């Protein structure tokens, strides 16, 4: 059996099925509120962003941690974060970061910070993910997916602590997206002092379960699959948040989130069920915010095995799948067909690329040319969970399965672990 799957985009992949233009957030107008309840769609994996891969985890962690650099609100331009400025050498290989002074850490019942954020913490964030000798490399998990998928371990040649507030990173080669990579959620900075204290106490896992950050909120309480409670951090370097109490009410079912919103049990919810959109838009008490998502859903092939090592087979599969039918049936017109693995809201998106047409006759010919005139059998893995870019992976897989059967490809649907 050969294998291909429908999944999220953790890095550079070879094929895709749909980019989402989806209502990302909606809510009841809440003026000058001191408490906001957010109906989150799931529990975080943990409170260590370095090994997180889901939006729910990043949403939970982004309240707690700051990053060295950030993306501007609503865009992808890189702006200062914990680094107030930086310099790049003429050859594009040396980045010198000048860090903010006076950035405070959250308090913890087992740890009271004795110093502000400094270069040691930035270096700890990078070395924990990229240096196997770091004592925290394997704590919670050693699977630093984003860091590895971006090639950081091979890209970073050296990290130099120039002084308490200056860090110099030398790369093996120029890398245009390096700053953008550091602005992503996985690069949230943890306290090295806190990590050292918990390591000495024999409880290193506490760092990822009872987090200490420099972000706008500190964690008050977390009950898995139920609630996360945050409190605004008065000493946040960018100014105290306008909302005093932030509550994540974990609600996995989109229709239940909508019901809670209607009853006033939450003020904000993400990713409504497409079937509820008409009612949502007609409700005068609801404000709907939507834009093209910064994500894609895709169909990935295992190109190391036959027949997917042959581009003609991959092209045939792409031409055999009716993307419009998937968008109409699953996304209810809130998605758009993707023609490359970069979402349209990203700066490097190339709109000039032409997608393959839906043409099953041409797909059959390509299979025959590749030596598969009678088709073949394969596994089709689908996510068992709902994601913003894929609200019903099983249904999408079933639609793909039916399309592929028409060109002689027998696909058996299985569950992919994501």
Residue ranges and their predicted role:
Residues 13, 130-195:
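Surface-exposed binding/hinge segments that line
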Residues 39-91, 127, 212-214:
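N-terminal lobe/hinge region of extracytoplasmic solute-binding protein
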Residues 72-73, 153-154, 164-165, 175-241, ...:
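Gly/Pro-rich hinge or "lid" segments in bacterial periplasmic/extracellular proteins
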Residues 84-135, 168, 260, 307:
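Aromatic- and charge-enriched surface segment that lines or borders ligand/interaction sites
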Residues 181-182, 304, 308-346, 392:
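Periplasmic-binding protein-like
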Residues 205-208, 233-279, 397, 410-412:
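Ligand-site clamp/hinge motif
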Residues 217, 337-370, 385-395:
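Structural transition elements
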Residues 224, 346, 368-417:
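Ligand/substrate-recognition segments at binding pockets and active sites
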């Amino acid at each position: 059996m050969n294998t291909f799957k429908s999944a999220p985009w953790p890095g550079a992949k070879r094929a895709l099925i749909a980019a989402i233009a989806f209502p990302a957030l909606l809510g009841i107008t809440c003026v000058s509120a001191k408490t906001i309840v957010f109906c989150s769609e799931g529990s975080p994996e943990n409170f260590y962003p370095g090994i997180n891969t889901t939006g729910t985890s990043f949403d939970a962690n982004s309240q707690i941690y700051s990053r060295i650099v950030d993306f501007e609100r609503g865009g992808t331009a890189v702006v200062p974060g914990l680094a107030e400025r930086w310099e790049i050498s003429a050859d594009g290989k040396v980045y010198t970061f000048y860090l903010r002074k006076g950035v405070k850490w959250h308090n913890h019942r087992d740890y009271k910070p004795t110093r502000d954020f400094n270069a040691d913490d930035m270096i700890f964030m990078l070395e924990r993910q990229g240096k196997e000798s770091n004592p925290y490399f394997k704590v919670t998990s050693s699977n630093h997916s984003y860091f590895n998928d971006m090639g950081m371990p091979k890209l970073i040649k050296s990290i130099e602590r120039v002084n308490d507030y200056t860090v110099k990173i030398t790369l093996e080669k120029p890398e245009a997206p390096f700053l953008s990579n550091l602005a992503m959620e996985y690069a949230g900075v943890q306290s090295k002092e806190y990590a050292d204290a918990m390591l000495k106490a024999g409880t290193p896992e506490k760092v990822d379960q009872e987090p200490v950050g420099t972000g706008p909120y500190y964690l008050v309480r977390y009950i898995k699959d139920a609630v996360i409670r945050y409190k605004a951090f008065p000493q946040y370097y960018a100014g105290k948040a306008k909302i005093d109490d932030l509550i994540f009410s974990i609600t996995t079912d989109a229709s239940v989130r909508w019901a809670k919103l209607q009853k006033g049990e939450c003020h904000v919810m993400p990713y409504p069920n497409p079937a509820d959109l008409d009612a949502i838009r007609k409700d005068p008490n609801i404000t709907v915010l939507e834009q093209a998502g910064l994500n894609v859903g895709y169909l990935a092939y295992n190109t190391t095995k036959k027949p997917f090592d042959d581009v003609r087979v991959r092209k045939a599969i792409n031409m055999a799948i009716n993307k419009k039918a998937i968008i109409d049936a699953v996304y209810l017109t809130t998605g758009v067909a993707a023609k490359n693995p970069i979402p349209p809201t990203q700066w490097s998106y190339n709109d000039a690329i032409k997608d393959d047409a839906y043409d099953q006759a041409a797909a059959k010919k390509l299979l025959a040319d590749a030596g598969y005139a009678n088709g073949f059998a394969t596994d089709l893995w689908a996510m068992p969970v709902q994601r913003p870019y894929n609200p019903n992976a099983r249904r999408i897989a079933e639609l793909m399965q039916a399309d592929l059967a028409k060109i002689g490809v027998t696909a058996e649907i299985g569950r992919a672990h994501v």
